[in-house]
Amino acid sequence: MEALATHRHARTSAQKARLVADQIRGLHVEKALELLAYSPKKSADLIKKVLESAIANAEHNEGADIDELTVSKVFVDEGPTMKRIKPRAKGRADRIFKRSSHITVVVADN
């Protein structure tokens, strides 16, 4: 059985979050949580929260045993981009892109 959790509009770029997501794909959930706890990246904290939510969903909704769960799928899609203006010298302006992403974690027992 599978349990899913998502975090939509996470304030990190999808490219940066995918670096962390690729590290935990296919791991046992305890090993994945340990790896995320010691990762220095901001997106590791976001993915850790989503993983904990997916584990709780599996336990509560599906009645799954936590000791048998693995991270079956992790994917990070691009969310909406906020566009901002940064004033520059001589009346010019640069665009700033504040990117967001949608993080999805699926856990399953073997």
Curated annotation (Swiss-Prot):
CDD domains cross-referenced by the UniProt entry: Ribosomal_L22
A molecular function GO annotation: rRNA binding
SUPFAM superfamilies, sorted: Ribosomal protein L22 (SSF54843)
Record-level GO BP terms: translation
Listed InterPro entries: Ribosomal_uL22, Ribosomal_uL22_bac/chlpt-type, Ribosomal_uL22_bac/org-type, Ribosomal_uL22_CS, Ribosomal_uL22_sf
Cellular component, GO, one term: cytosolic large ribosomal subunit
Highest taxon above the source species: Bacteria
Keyword annotations: Ribonucleoprotein, Ribosomal protein, RNA-binding, rRNA-binding
UniProt function note: This protein binds specifically to 23S rRNA; its binding is stimulated by other ribosomal proteins, e.g. L4, L17, and L20. It is important during the early stages of 50S assembly. It makes multiple contacts with different domains of the 23S rRNA in the assembled 50S subunit and ribosome.
Family: Belongs to the universal ribosomal protein uL22 family.
Subunit details: Part of the 50S ribosomal subunit.
Protein name per its UniProtKB record: Large ribosomal subunit protein uL22
